[in-house]
Amino acid sequence: MVSVAFKQNLKKKYGIKFNNEKLLEDAFTHSSYANEHPGRKDYEKLEFLGDAVLELAVSDYLYRHFPRLNEGELTRMRSNIVRTEGFSEFAIECGFPEEINLGKGEEKAGARKRKTLLEDVFEAFNGALFLDQGMPAVQHFLHLTVYPLIAEGDFNASRDYKTELQERLQVNGPVKIEYQVISEDESKPSFKVQLLVNGEKVSEGQGRNKKAAEQQAAQAALDKNK
């Protein structure tokens, strides 16, 4: 069962109160739990729907907010957003892992922390929200969770700063480039890395995942050498 505290947080933080709470329950029910509890439905069909809903919602947002990007750049950015790592982090941020109904075997196997499962639940939740309240409610939820990070450039696929930096530094021969994690907070999540060139610190970067932090560090290094 989805906890009362979670439902209260949904209302307080995101303004979401399900009219049909069974949809919410189904969105957090893994097939392993449904197999152990006859009569319970798992989230697989909601996940199927949510995948399509999220792709449409994100595509619409990118089309409206990034008019200068071409089709290829928009596609790459969308791919970065909807990848497993991205949605699993949003699921963690929203407190989804604790609410998932798992079978005993999956619970023992640590499935609650599995990124692919968290991505599935995030998609299922949005599928359930779409059925319960329509696309405007989904867009509202994404405006509070996903879209702010798109606006900040966390998923920018139009430039690859790491590759640009590597090409610039190695123009005269091999150079050792390292990205080291300084700190991480998986509860948020947030990563901070430092960039070393031939063992010397050049810059730092921070992001909601290691890849984003490394890109920011590379961008900072490029900005220093403009």
Swiss-Prot record:
The keyword Protease does not apply. Residues 201-226 are annotated as: Disordered. The active site is at D51, E123. Residues 214-226 have a biased composition (Low complexity). Residues 160-226 form the DRBM domain. Its cofactor is Mg(2+). GO terms for molecular function: double-stranded RNA binding; metal ion binding; ribonuclease III activity; rRNA binding. InterPro entries: dsRBD_dom, RNase_III, RNase_III_dom, RNase_III_sf. Pfam families: dsrm (PF00035), Ribonucleas_3_3 (PF14622). Its EC number is 3.1.26.3. It catalyses: Endonucleolytic cleavage to 5'-phosphomonoester. The keyword Nuclease applies. GO terms for cellular component: cytoplasm. One of its GO terms (biological process) is rRNA processing. Keywords: Cytoplasm, Endonuclease, Hydrolase, Magnesium, Metal-binding, mRNA processing, Nuclease, RNA-binding, rRNA processing, rRNA-binding, tRNA processing. It is found in: Cytoplasm. NCBIfam families: RNaseIII (TIGR02191). Digests double-stranded RNA. Involved in the processing of primary rRNA transcript to yield the immediate precursors to the large and small rRNAs (23S and 16S). Processes some mRNAs, and tRNAs when they are encoded in the rRNA operon. Processes pre-crRNA and tracrRNA of type II CRISPR loci if present in the organism. Homodimer. Belongs to the ribonuclease III family. This is Ribonuclease 3.
